Amino acid sequence: WSRLSTAVTIAADNAAVQLQNSWEELMTRLEPEPEPAEDIQLVDSEEVAPPPRPIASFSITTLICRNSQEYLTGGARELFYYNQTADLWAEGLYGTDSISGYGCGPTAMAMVVSTLTGTPIDPVQMSQHCVDNGYWARRQGSYRTIVQGVAEDFGLVCESLSLEDQDDISRRLATGQLVVALMGPGHFTNGGHFIVLRGVTLDGSILVADPASSDRSLTTWELDLILEELSASRHSGGPLWAVSAPF
């Protein structure tokens, strides 16, 4: 009788575990995909080849480390730099997705918020903030509302920029504003990818902070190329947003 009782208990426990696993799998399948698609970043999982151009001169920009925090120099201000593939948070969660694969949005906004407020917030913390506030799009990256939403959440000013006025974009960068860009297929991504425009050089080239590549972050870029490769969607004020600290 004792053996029978033990066998029944084990069988019941196994059945309960299987039932729980089946329930969780069912709920995952039933969870609706984000809509509308036009308002989603639509990331890709394939790595982009390194840019076919040399790293910029040390006198123009470089990546430095101070008190365990990385910064990109150049432009009007140093910028807090976070890489979504860094060991510290690559396997951290953005909702149920990995930061390394889907977290360019919160990583880009972590750089912007940390730089403009002076208070560090890392990709793990920003990812949780984005999940809590509805900016995470399961298996697709981020809703494009992430840029204006996060900026306002942290007391920053966010404006949608015209793609026709290159002088305005350069002026904003020269005066210390940061510009978040949602890129389409090209040098930065095969699908959709948030980067930060962080400065302009004397010859008019653009400095960027790419949350997926320190090499691309240390390369200068023509503004024409960046504008040509922006996402074609114009939802939620994108694909170009200027973010600044309030006066």
Which residues are covered by each model-predicted region?
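Extracytoplasmic/secreted envelope proteins and their assembly/folding machinery
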Residues: G105-V113, P123-S127, R144-A151, Q166, ...
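Short, well-ordered alpha-helical segments in soluble proteins
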Residues: A108, V112-L116, F154, L173, ...
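Solvent-exposed loop/turn segments at secondary-structure junctions
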Residues: D87-L88, M111, P120, Y135-A137, ...
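Noncatalytic regulatory segments and standalone regulatory/sensor domains
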Residues: Q69, V200-F247
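Active-site-adjacent structural segments surrounding the nucleophilic cysteine of cysteine proteases
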Residues: W1-W136
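Active-site-adjacent substructure of cysteine-protease-like catalytic cores
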Residues: V157-L207, L227, A242-P246
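Mid-length scaffold segments of soluble, non-membrane domains
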Residues: P120-P123, S127-E164, A174
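Extracytoplasmic/periplasmic, Sec-exported soluble proteins
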Residues: T96-G105, G118, Y135, R139-Y143, ...
